[in-house]
UniProtKB/Swiss-Prot annotation:
Transmembrane segments: none annotated. One of its GO terms (molecular function) is ATP binding. This is V-type ATP synthase alpha chain. GO terms for biological process: proton motive force-driven plasma membrane ATP synthesis. InterPro entries: ATP-synt_VA_C, ATP-synth_a_Xtn, ATP_synth_asu-like_sf, ATPase_a/bsu_AS, ATPase_F1/V1/A1_a/bsu_N, ATPase_F1/V1/A1_a/bsu_N_sf, ATPase_F1/V1/A1_a/bsu_nucl-bd, ATPase_F1/V1_b/a_C. SUPFAM superfamilies: C-terminal domain of alpha and beta subunits of F1 ATP synthase, N-terminal domain of alpha and beta subunits of F1 ATP synthase, P-loop containing nucleoside triphosphate hydrolases.
């Protein structure tokens, strides 16, 4: 008996006669064979969310189960590709159909015509273990390890080499099983690992305010809430360019089409500081704009996460950028409403927190099955309406992530980039990572960080007083706090994304800059206590020199800092003598 549609409600349809279907199984819906996924089963009646536009579907049209869950293709050729939320290759579809895609469009995610030169690292007679590296596949300048699927083991009977397509078998086992360059994996099932490793190595972003004040571990999770115009996209582009990640997976989930078009236009022009080639060469884009079907938006973050886990299994460090989880949650809300489920706060489903937590738990630094150590670090942008951080998506994300990098509209309007609000932001991993920074960046890192945070907190208190009584009414020591905090904000916390030197800052350089800022403040405090007037110190112009430290290369920062220290000592000695 053929299953037939009995109800259609937007992206959600109901079909009778699917008694043998499984939850999360792919179903071909209607005469045009639209892609759908089973999300609820009641006897032989299945509720299906359709990943394409359902306008024009009619009751009584067929629904055909595929027997497989929603899965993605993993293999050589992923890097530099642009997919939609269910891994259809947008470049290839645009070449075939033009700018607007028709319904039922199908193309394999990986190019079957492209040939890869295989250099095997296994031989006939070897015992194959799950996740083992079988060799390297090369095509032009691109080279990628070939992994055995996680569920396959046995004795190798045959190994092929030479130019192969991704769907051709490269290894045949004694039991007849064949392994090709590509493998398929269900998007909602995490890929297996050997064991998780301690999160005691930082995910270096190159941004001083994040690395020094609110660090996140490699394999950790961070959320970036911010309203319109606060710089979420620019920050994520900077992270993609300068963070310590071998591969970047960028998921544009439900953002406006023109914003995604801008990202697609800008990324090929950005230069990768590591290789000198285009940044797109180590990036995978999963694009699902707000005018695409809402159900595919819900699947897109799982597609991106599965691709990230595949590169992690090669022993690589992967940064997974989600922009934004708010749009994903809105898709959940719409699907939940179509299912007539009981709504929670602001109409979001009651399982929003558990779904978010389950997704963020797929991050981690791990020992892979066969390729050593790898990590997936997830950075999720949140777009709270009106910048309200008390709304449900922000609050659920707070409970599931290890760091909050809150973007401030006020700082963004003052041209302060990155516009990270140090009064709201926090990191649960800062203390755990302190030991690494003390070893690798230099002793005293944690103490300097704490001292700088106290200085910024003291500034906030004094600003409130100054707004009431005026800056002139403050004592010299209090006005010095305001001036030192201003220099710290503008010279240390602010970075230019367009300065080739200051765009990324290594930890040792950041430590030297922070130490110098706080040393100058401490010496000035002592000088004022000894009777030196504040205006005499400010007129010397050392502040302007301090603001230019960020533009010094890392190897020259120590020399520049010593010269500034010597100049300060000479100035204060002369002022104290007077």
């Amino acid at each position: 008996m053929t299953a037939r549609l009995v109800r259609i409600a937007g992206p959600t349809v109901v079909a009778d006669g699917l008694a043998g279907a499984a939850l999360n199984e792919v179903v071909w819906v209607g005469e045009e064979r639209l892609l759908g996924e089973v999300i609820r089963l009641e006897g032989d009646r299945a509720t299906i969310q359709v990943y394409e536009e359902t306008a024009g579907l009619a009751l009584g049209e067929p629904a055909e189960p595929s027997g497989e869950p929603l899965a993605v293709e993993l293999g050589p050729g992923l890097l530099g590709s642009v997919f939609d939320g269910v891994q259809r290759p947008l470049d290839a579809l645009a070449a075939q159909q033009g700018d607007f895609l028709g319904r039922g469009a199908r193309l394999p995610a990986l190019d079957r015509a492209r040939r890869w030169e295989l250099e095997p690292s296994v031989r006939r007679g070897d015992d194959l273990v799950p996740g083992a590296c079988l060799g390297v596949a090369r095509s032009g300048a691109e080279a990628q390890p070939l992994l055995a699927p996680p569920h396959v083991r046995g004795r190798i009977a045959e190994v092929r080499s030479g130019a192969l397509a991704v769907d051709e078998p490269v290894v045949r086992l004694a039991d007849g099983a064949e392994i090709a360059l590509l493998q398929r994996w269900p998007v909602r099932r995490p890929r297996p690992i050997r064991r998780r490793l301690a999160p005691d190595v930082p995910f270096l972003t190159g941004q001083r305010v994040l690395d020094c004040f609110f660090p996140v571990s490699a394999g950790g999770t961070a959320m970036v809430p911010g309203g319109f115009g606060t710089g979420k996209t620019v920050l994520e582009q900077s992270l993609a360019k300068h963070a310590a990640a071998d591969v970047v997976v960028y998921v544009g989930c439900g953002e406006r089409g023109n914003e995604m078009a801008e990202v697609l236009d800008e990324l090929p022009k950005l230069e990768d500081p590591r290789s000198g080639g285009p940044l797109l060469g180590r990036t995978v884009l999963v694009v699902n704009t707000s005018n695409m079907p809402v159900a595919a938006r819900e699947a897109s973050i799982y597609t991106g996460c599965t691709i990230a886990e595949y590169f992690r299994d090669m022993g690589r460090s992967v940064a997974l950028m989600i922009d934004s989880t708010s749009r994903w949650a809105e898709a959940l809300r719409e699907i939940s409403a179509r299912l007539e489920e009981m709504p929670g706060e602001e109409g979001y489903p009651t399982y929003l927190a558990s779904r978010l937590a389950r997704f963020y738990e797929r991050a981690g630094r791990v020992e892979t099955l066969g390729c050593g150590e790898g990590a997936v670090t997830i950075v999720g942008a949140v777009s709270p309406p009106g910048g309200d951080l008390s709304e449900p998506v922000t609050q659920c994300s707070l409970r599931a992530t290890g760091a909050l990098w809150a973007l401030s509209a006020d700082l963004a309007h003052r041209r302060h980039y990155p516009a990270v609000d140090w009064a709201i932001s926090f990191s649960l991993e800062a203390e755990r990572l302190r030991g690494w920074f003390e070893r690798e960046a230099g002793e005293g890192f944690g103490a300097l960080r704490d001292e700088a945070m106290k200085l910024l907190q003291r500034e906030r208190e004094l600003v409130e007083v100054a707004e009431l009584v005026g800056t002139e009414s403050l004592q010299d020591a209090e006005r010095l706090v305001l001036e030192s905090a201003r220099l710290l904000r503008e010279g240390f916390l602010r970075q230019s994304a367009y300065d080739p030197v200051d765009a990324s800052c290594p930890p040792r350089k950041a430590l030297e800059m922070l130490r110098l800022h706080l040393e100058l403040h401490g010496r000035a405090v002592n000088a004022i206590a000894g009777g030196v007037p504040l205006h005499s110190i400010l007129e010397a112009g050392l502040g302007a020199r301090l603001l230019r430290l960020g533009s010094l290369p890392a190897e020259a920062i120590a020399r520049g800092a010593e010269a500034l220290r010597a100049e300060l000592e000479g100035l204060l000695a002369r002022l104290e003598a007077e």
